[in-house]
């Protein structure tokens, strides 16, 4: 699950007795990288560097980030996610070839579980950005972007494929949901907890 995370590999070289002290430092580094990559993404759309800085800090220290501190691998994904958005913008607006494939491969390696959600988000992001005047998408660029996405997934297959096979071998995936569990959470407080995490 963590084999593609660069932060995980840092923890493997540290002595076990240091882990208690290393985790807060690593979380700080992850939040710093998240702020930096979000800043790099946001600065493309605002005039003021201060606005980009505030946006980067809001991203890095959002309710989602802080609520999920106890899952230290969540921050691995959010630290590098803006790179996918930057790569898409570069591919479409600057005709940079290969950058999107590398970003897709990186995110596919970091965490396969979050990668599926990121893929859905990027499709929605592309659709929404097509309505913007500063997004110069053409059918040719779209197909090149789709090809780069496929290449990125293929590059990440050395981690994605074993992970998929392990998940498919799990006997719990054959279980089914019945009744209201198919439509809604059975815990009545979960929705409120999700909304609460936004603040």
Q: Where do the model's predicted regions map?
A:
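Short hydrophobic/aromatic helix or loop-helix immediately within or flanking a transmembrane segment
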Residues: 1-17
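Short, flexible segments with low predicted structural confidence
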Residues: 13-14, 60, 136
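Periplasmic/ER-lumenal interhelical loops and adjacent helix-loop junctions
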Residues: 6, 141-142, 149-199
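Membrane-interfacial, low-structure loops and terminal tails that flank and connect transmembrane helices
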Residues: 135-141
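Membrane-embedded helix bundles of polyisoprenyl
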Residues: 27-28, 32-45, 49-131, 144-164, ...
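Short alpha-helical transmembrane interface motifs in multi-pass membrane proteins
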Residues: 19-23, 144
């Amino acid at each position: 699950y963590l084999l593609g995370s660069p932060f995980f590999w840092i923890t493997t070289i540290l002595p076990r007795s240091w882990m208690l002290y290393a985790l807060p430092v690593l979380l700080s580094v992850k939040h710093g990288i998240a702020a930096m990559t979000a800043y790099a993404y946001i600065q493309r759309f605002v005039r003021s560097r201060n606005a980009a800085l505030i946006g980067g800090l809001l991203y890095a220290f959002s309710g989602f980030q802080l609520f999920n501190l106890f899952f230290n691998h969540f921050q691995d994904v959010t630290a590098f996610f803006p790179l996918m958005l930057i790569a898409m913008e570069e591919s479409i607006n600057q005709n940079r070839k290969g950058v999107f494939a590398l970003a897709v491969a990186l995110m596919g390696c970091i965490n396969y579980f979050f990668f599926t959600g990121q893929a859905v988000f990027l499709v929605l992001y592309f659709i929404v950005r097509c309505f913007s005047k500063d997004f110069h998408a053409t059918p040719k660029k779209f197909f090149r972007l789709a090809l780069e996405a496929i290449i990125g997934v293929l590059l990440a297959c050395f981690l994605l494929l074993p992970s998929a096979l392990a998940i498919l071998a799990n006997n719990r995936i054959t279980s089914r949901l019945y009744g209201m569990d198919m439509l809604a959470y059975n815990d009545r407080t979960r929705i409120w907890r999700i909304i609460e995490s936004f603040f």
